[in-house]
A protein has these predicted regions:
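ATP/NTP phosphate-donor binding region
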Residues: 1-74, 297
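Short glycine/serine/threonine-rich phosphate/pyrophosphate-binding segments
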Residues: 8, 31-35, 83-89, 108-112, ...
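A short, small-residue-rich loop immediately preceding and capping a beta-strand
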Residues: 68-91, 95-106
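A glycine/threonine-rich phosphate-anchoring loop and its flanking beta-alpha core
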Residues: 93-185
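Short alpha-helical scaffolding segments that buttress acidic/His motifs in well-ordered protein cores
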Residues: 161-165, 209-223, 261, 288, ...
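Active-site segments that bind and position negatively charged phosphate/pyrophosphate groups
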Residues: 175-290
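C-terminal charged capping/lid subdomain of soluble metabolic enzymes
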Residues: 275-365
Length: 365
């Protein structure tokens, strides 16, 4: 792991350790943003670039394999956000090549995780692929990350803070040392974000900003690496996955995940009557208001979704292999729908297994 201000300019020898013919994989916009930073460190190598188009999809991966074959690539360098990093990691895994990731924003922890998500060509989540190891190298250059819109860091905070709310549930009562350590790291990560996020957003490039970038990109990634599948996703990411099947309105991954945390807490509150979940949800609502994270479907521009679309999203979130079933109680699509439309409800508002009507959906938010 290499991190710091301007570190990409000095990373040429590190990239050269991975190979002499790198294929640089990213999206059109991320390649445009990153290549000025990569030009100098890659000057002594025989480099080609390949764009993954819109999503890390099976069709995109086929094209990337062809590009790697044409170039006789011996390593992969992946600059970009979550989907670009996932594509680079998965391509490297499938071709058995080393990979270096270069995050262009702090929107996700994908640069340091042993996991890639695969989407349809229309952006709907299909499945994830657990990778046997983390990337060989991650280069986090604060100068490059600082070129990303503020919104990406806000989304990264939403994605990172989910680590606590999901890992504390998915880990159960595990006594394994690494899982215990990962859960405690997730709690510390949450506290850091509560304490420093507002100041970080007010002073881009400052000390707090760098600390929050480290938290969102690096610390969040370490938690999944230490804890494995038992410290990853639960309902918050399941809700994200469901929403990708009904809306492609430009909402960022971390924004949907942040909203999904509220849905998860609402499910805990409505089902077992978890008072702590109700308190946590109210705390997050205040935090989200401060940062500009979405608190409801309306905040994501999804208030016009039909009941059928909400049903589809909830059904996807509850499919048999969904991480939502890591909750310590069973849930069904009707309960998920009820939680999705009541994320801003007062603490202790009633809910349960009773199916909700169209009228309730329309008037809930």
């Amino acid at each position: 792991m290499v991190r710091g201000q301007g570190v990409l300019a000095e990373s040429g020898p590190l990239f050269a350790r991975l190979g002499k013919r790198p294929l640089v994989v990213g999206g059109d916009r991320t390649l445009q943003a990153a290549m000025p930073f990569l030009k100098a460190p890659l000057a002594e190598l025989t480099t080609a670039t390949a764009a993954y188009q819109k999503d890390c999809s099976e069709a995109a991966l086929t094209d990337l394999h062809q590009a790697a074959e044409r170039h006789s690539a011996d390593c992969i360098i992946g600059p970009g956000g979550g989907k670009a990093l996932d594509a680079a990691k998965l391509l490297a895994h499938q071709r058995q090549l080393p990979v270096a990731t270069v995050p262009t924003s702090a929107a996700t922890c994908a640069g340091w995780t042993a996991l890639s998500n695969v989407y349809s060509d229309r952006g709907a989540f299909l499945y994830d692929v657990g990778l046997p190891r983390c990337p060989e190298m991650i280069v986090l250059d604060y100068d490059l990350v600082a070129t990303a819109p503020k919104r990406t860091l806000v989304a990264g905070i939403g994605d990172a803070i989910a680590k606590w709310y999901e890992a504390s549930v998915s880990s159960g009562h595990s006594g394994h040392t690494l899982i215990i350590g990962a859960v405690q790291q997730a709690r510390v990560l949450r506290d850091i974000l509560f304490q420093k996020s507002a100041a970080a957003l007010e002073n881009p490039g400052g000390d707090d900003w760098r600390e929050v970038v480290d938290a969102a990109v690096l610390m969040a990634g370490v938690i999944g690496g230490m804890g494995g599948a038992q410290c990853r996703t639960v309902a918050a990411h399941a809700v994200h996955n469901g929403l990708t099947h009904v809306s492609a309105n430009g909402t960022l991954h971390g924004e949907k995940v942040a909203y999904g945390i509220l849905v998860q807490l609402r499910l805990e509150e409505m089902g077992p009557g978890n008072v702590l979940a109700a308190t946590s949800r109210q705390q997050l609502l205040q935090f989200y208001s401060q940062l500009g994270l979405p608190k409801s479907l309306a905040d994501m521009g999804m208030d016009k979704l039909t009941v059928a679309q909400l049903q589809q999203a909830a059904t996807v979130a509850c499919q048999a292999d969904s991480d939502i079933h890591r909750l310590p109680f069973s849930v069904d699509p009707d309960q998920v729908m009820a939680a999705m439309v009541s994320t801003t409800a007062p603490a202790g508002s009633p809910g349960g297994k009773t199916p909700i009507s169209t009228a309730q959906l329309i008037t809930s938010e």
